[in-house]
Amino acid sequence: MSPLLTARAASKSYRTVSLVGRSPAKTVLSEATVTLSEGETVALLGRSGSGKSTLARLLLGLEKPDHGTIAFRGRPLGGFSRAEWRAFRGAVQMVFQDSLGAVNPRHRVGRIIGEPLRHLTTLDDAGRAARRDALLRQVGLTPEDADKLPQQMSGGQLQRVCIARALAPGPRLLVLDEAVSNLDLMLQIQMIDLLKDLQRQTGMAYLFVTHDLRLVERFCQRVIVLDEGKIVEEAPVTGAQRFEHPASRALQRAILPARPAAASVGDDEGGRRSATR
């Protein structure tokens, strides 16, 4: 697998400003080195405040590292032209934890999915409509759902809409920032199985940002563990995961002993697909 997106010794600090002045800089990410390759699924695992979301924002180009570099297919983001940034925005997309907060509640589903098609592709009106309908079907919804408002959909359905929106420009990498954490166990399983199906169809890579080792074991091939802003461990995902670092083992002890499993899972309310294991 060829490298797709890399971080090399990336560090990030923040200061807070109050009425009494600026606070000392707090380092939230320290010399993180990560390589994401075509077609693989990598977990970024850590407790709250470990630096996971900061590293994800740097990889997405939403923030700049204080030190180190982020590169897409070997080209540092800091040297991108406007055209290269536009191509990068289409190639690397994100799905957020809060699906309702990630969409405009006044926009219908068709418009939500249509925004990246309008800004990141060269399709005409007819082409965008056809692509929108195909995306809805691809995530287990129907073209009729394009006329619905977000509040008319279940949580699982709306997360499918967010995935369809992220797929719209044909990305090579999806960053999933706690993207299934707000769903119940059965919906988590359905969403993971949907993402696996989409990966088989498209060959895209995933960066799965999470604190839940059970989902990592079900979904990912490789896991990177962060603690206090540092990468403390990196390992392939195995059926019986054995960690070395104390922070990794603490995460392992925190999960329930049973792994999620289902023989046959029905879809979320109003959904059209079922996941069968």
Swiss-Prot record:
Belongs to the ABC transporter superfamily. Nickel importer (TC 3.A.1.5.3) family. PROSITE patterns: ABC_TRANSPORTER_1, ABC_TRANSPORTER_2, NIKE. The complex is composed of two ATP-binding proteins (NikD and NikE), two transmembrane proteins (NikB and NikC) and a solute-binding protein (NikA). The lineage of its organism: Bacteria, Pseudomonadati, Pseudomonadota, Alphaproteobacteria, Rhodospirillales. This is Nickel import ATP-binding protein NikE. SUPFAM superfamilies: P-loop containing nucleoside triphosphate hydrolases. One of its GO terms (molecular function) is nickel cation binding. Part of the ABC transporter complex NikABCDE involved in nickel import. Responsible for energy coupling to the transport system. Pfam families: ABC_tran. It comes from the Bacteria. Residues 14-253 form the ABC transporter domain. It catalyses: Ni(2+)(out) + ATP + H2O = Ni(2+)(in) + ADP + phosphate + H(+). ATP binds at residues 46-53.
